[in-house]
Amino acid sequence: MADRIHWTVGQAQALFDKPLLELLFEAQTVHRQHFDPRQVQVSTLLSIKTGACPEDCKYCPQSPRYKTGLESERLMQVEQVLESARKAKANGSTRFCMGAAWKNPHERDMPYLQQMVQGVKAMGMETCMTLGTLDGTQAERLAEAGLDYYNHNLDTSPEFYGSIITTRSYQERLDTLDKVRDAGIKVCSGGIVGLGETVRDRAGLLVQLANLPKPPESVPINMLVKVKGTPLADNDDVDPFDFIRTIAVARIMMPSSYVRLSAGREQMNEQTQAMCFMAGANSIFYGCKLLTTPNPEEDKDLQLFRKLGLNPQQTATEHGDNQQQQVLAKQLLNADTAEFYNAAP
């Protein structure tokens, strides 16, 4: 196995500065060396706990600091989550991601989260969660339940980060990724394009990700979805070619990682998405909503796949374990009280 490159910001920026077609050729070449270029991994993301998040991320409508009109919702019952997972699997998703608007999960939440993971795993789907900061014990408990991936984005470069978020440090995010990795869970971590960052900041984000002790298995690249009421609602639109460049550089710097088109696809036309796949994207979120912002409908995605000759990737455990599902159905936990599901303060 070839030695990994320890990337510098200068090296990453040099990739961004390449002529676009030359960059795309290099990215597609790298992509074909590590993946089947016709296969796209398909995930579905469900918000299992919406709003009332104590963080101040300037892009996010889930913070009560901003008047966005978003109504907060308590943690979903386990069976509700599993029903959504069944629908996602029927529609072609192979990974089910569950997101909660918390700074961190509390001890009282853990039994419910563990049952969600166990139930989705029993269907033969891969599991992913994004719950905020984790401690080592929480990561281990989720791993024991069978969690495959944990998402915790770095969002942007260390230098620009403080302009976007003040309630959680960059180091806290890196520490959570370390705890996830130590627990044996695969890492999903990426960032957002369009926060007001420079190209050097985009390079800095990708350097942070690529230089982790082990690069993330999954790297979601989001385009800012501007939500009225958030501080970034009036940001300039992202040039599609700048976004495509970011995908291409991510592919070159993290050749074995899945690079996912995440939030913002609703704003992209088919041509832009096609160029992202050419640049090395090989994973998407599939369905009508990403947490609280729009996403293309499933049938539009399938139509685009047919036009481009792409195929949804299948998993080895797609049939699931019916016996395990029946056992879990008898054990599902329900809320003890209405207050049980309040967001972590």
Curated annotation (Swiss-Prot):
SMART domains: BATS, Elp3
Domain of life: Bacteria
Cofactor note: Binds 1 [4Fe-4S] cluster. The cluster is coordinated with 3 cysteines and an exchangeable S-adenosyl-L-methionine. Binds 1 [2Fe-2S] cluster. The cluster is coordinated with 3 cysteines and 1 arginine.
Uppermost EC category: transferase
GO biological process, one term: biotin biosynthetic process
Record keywords: 2Fe-2S, 4Fe-4S, Biotin biosynthesis, Iron, Iron-sulfur, Metal-binding, S-adenosyl-L-methionine, Transferase
Molecular function (Gene Ontology), one example: iron ion binding
Catalysed reaction equations from the record: (4R,5S)-dethiobiotin + (sulfur carrier)-SH + 2 reduced [2Fe-2S]-[ferredoxin] + 2 S-adenosyl-L-methionine = (sulfur carrier)-H + biotin + 2 5'-deoxyadenosine + 2 L-methionine + 2 oxidized [2Fe-2S]-[ferredoxin]
E.C. number(s) listed in UniProt: 2.8.1.6
Binding site for [2Fe-2S] cluster: C97, C128, C188, R260
Domain Radical SAM core as annotated: residue spans: 38-256
Cofactor: [4Fe-4S] cluster; [2Fe-2S] cluster
Record's function text: Catalyzes the conversion of dethiobiotin (DTB) to biotin by the insertion of a sulfur atom into dethiobiotin via a radical-based mechanism.
Family indicated by similarity: Belongs to the radical SAM superfamily. Biotin synthase family.
NCBIfam families from the UniProt entry: bioB (TIGR00433)
Protein known as: Biotin synthase
Encoding gene (name): bioB
